[in-house]
Structure formats: C-alpha cells, structure tokens
C-alpha cells in the first residue's frame, strides 16, 4: 500500500467514517480509529469537539488540506456576503483537483492532486499544474492526449461507486469536462454528512 493510500485510509479511521464511499475503506470492517488506543469507546463530544471534527472531516475529504490552506479558503468564504458555509463548499468544489475528481478522470481526490501536479490536465486548452487553481463557470477541463491511456484514468472512468454530479458536464469519450456552475452543499454528492455550519461556528470561536 502506498503512503498516499495509507494516509487516505488513516483519515477514514480517524473520522470513523468512510468519507469517500470507497469499498476498501477499513471502516467497512471495524468501528474504531487508528493506533493502539483506537478500540476504546469514544465518549460524547462537546460542542467544540463536534465543530473540530466537522472541520477535520471537510479538510480530510479534499485531500487532507493543511490548516493554512483550509483557513485561507474559509477566510475568502467569510468575506463574501451570504451563507459562509455554502460559500466554503462552493470554493472547495472549484479547486481544479476537486473538479478532476468529480469528473471521474481519476479514482480519488489524492490521485487528482497528483494528476494535476504532474501536468496531465488543461483548462481551456492551457496546461495547469496547480491543484488549488480556481475553476470558473464555463471552464473546460481536459485530460491531455498523452495521458488518456494512463491506468489511473481508465480505472476511474469505469468506477460504479460514484456518479458525476450535474454541475460538471463530463464527456468520457473525449476526456473533457465543463464546470457548469458552482454547487451548494445540497448539490455535492458527499457519501457522509458534511456540516460546514459547524466549521463556521468553530472559526467564529477560535
């Protein structure tokens, strides 16, 4: 198992949930966290604990973002007028690696980050290798011709465990995807419950 795959499943174990809905997640087989103390029964979380957990789960889902990365995105959402939690979700879903994942060009969000980093993707015909690149409505994301037959791409397209959401218009025959619109929380096909409202509460108090 690669370090990247190990890190992904460690997040699942830490959260106690299969946050990406993967069949091989270890939490499908056991109900405790990682490490030697993982089998201890967890007590009821405080309000702070619930807020922290909501933040950690959302950070983890998008590839285990660093606190600095996540806090910067949150600060941008907070500056917008309206529902900060909804804006936070929209900004996260506009990351290029998130769109590559949603389009089913790759099997995991971790693979999406690596795929973009290695220069396999274009946006409106121009190569972009920055996973955090902010996609706009109408942008066309494509897998470069030389990358279309990579095993990771062929595996992802055939995955039955998740569908492409309606805010991404993917054409797998051409390996292109148009970002149609910025989604809200109810539009995003999270396999588990995400609570951006608790993330807002966390940052309001800390």
From Swiss-Prot:
Keyword Cell inner membrane: no
InterPro entries in the record: Ribosomal_uS4, Ribosomal_uS4_bac-type, Ribosomal_uS4_CS, Ribosomal_uS4_N, S4_RNA-bd, S4_RNA-bd_sf
Superkingdom per UniProt: Bacteria
Pfam families assigned to the protein according to its UniProt record, in alphabetical order: Ribosomal_S4, S4
Statement: the UniProt record of this protein carries the keyword rRNA-binding: yes
Spans annotated as Disordered: 18-44
Molecular function GO labels: rRNA binding; structural constituent of ribosome
Domain S4 RNA-binding: 94-157
Gene3D superfamilies according to UniProt: Ribosomal Protein S4 Delta 41, Chain A, domain 1 (1.10.1050.10), RNA-binding S4 domain (3.10.290.10)
Keywords from the named record: Ribonucleoprotein, Ribosomal protein, RNA-binding, rRNA-binding
SUPFAM superfamilies: Alpha-L RNA-binding motif
Protein family membership: Belongs to the universal ribosomal protein uS4 family.
Subunit structure: Part of the 30S ribosomal subunit. Contacts protein S5. The interaction surface between S4 and S5 is involved in control of translational fidelity.
Role played: One of the primary rRNA binding proteins, it binds directly to 16S rRNA where it nucleates assembly of the body of the 30S subunit.
Protein name: Small ribosomal subunit protein uS4
Organism name: Jannaschia sp. (strain CCS1)
């Amino acid at each position: 198992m690669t370090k990247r795959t190990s890190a992904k499943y460690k997040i699942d174990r830490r959260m106690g949930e299969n946050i990406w809905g993967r069949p091989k997640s270890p939490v499908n087989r056991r109900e405790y966290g990682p490490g030697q103390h993982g089998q201890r029964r967890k007590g009821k979380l405080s309000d702070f604990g619930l807020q922290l957990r909501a933040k950690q789960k959302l950070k983890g889902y998008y590839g285990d973002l660093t606190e600095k990365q996540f806090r910067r995105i949150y600060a941008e959402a907070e500056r917008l007028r309206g529902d900060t939690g909804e804006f936070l979700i929209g900004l996260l879903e506009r990351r290029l690696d998130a769109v590559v994942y949603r389009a089913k060009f790759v099997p995991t969000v971790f693979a999406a980050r690596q795929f973009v980093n290695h220069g396999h993707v274009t946006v409106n015909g121009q190569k972009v290798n920055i996973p955090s690149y902010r996609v706009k409505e109408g942008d066309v994301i494509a897998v470069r011709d030389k990358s279309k037959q990579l095993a990771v791409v062929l595996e992802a397209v055939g995955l039955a465990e998740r569908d492409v959401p309606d805010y991404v218009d993917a054409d797998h025959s051409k390996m292109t995807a148009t970002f149609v619109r910025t989604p809200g929380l109810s539009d995003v096909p999270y396999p588990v419950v995400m609570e951006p409202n608790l993330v807002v509460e966390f940052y309001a108090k800390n």
